Amino acid sequence: MSANKLARSAQGLQSSAIRELLKHSKMAGVISLGGGIPNPDLFDREGLKIASDAVLSQHFGEAFQYGLTEGVPGLREEIKRICEGRGITCKADDVVITSGSQQSLDVLARALINPGDTVVVERPTYLAALQVFGLAQANFESV
């Protein structure tokens, strides 16, 4: 697709640093210490099987459907209870479940960052956070 058909905000986008790291993590002989790719041998296969079987036997009708965008009400209620146990007052409606760090950072950036704002990040930092904050047109200050 030619760049002039893209929105101005998309015309200068570059490949993500994470995408570049993932390419290297797949190379023979490379032991990845990043990229969010844990060793599958470390997964709790039996525990995952038990959990999967429980979901499929108890909630089959819902397991393969789209859910509420803010998350499953029972999970949000449980998180509210955990927060209250730690002295944090909130309602289940205050809790939003996301599909991982990228979505969480994107939601936060859209809600809290205006173009030109400065975001303080630690050094070293999570590369994907820089990508999200960059799309929000933020400046970075590392500490």
Model-derived features: positions:
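N-terminal "arm"/small-domain region of PLP-dependent enzymes with the aminotransferase-like
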Residues: 1-69, 73
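Conserved core of the PLP fold type I
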Residues: 57-143
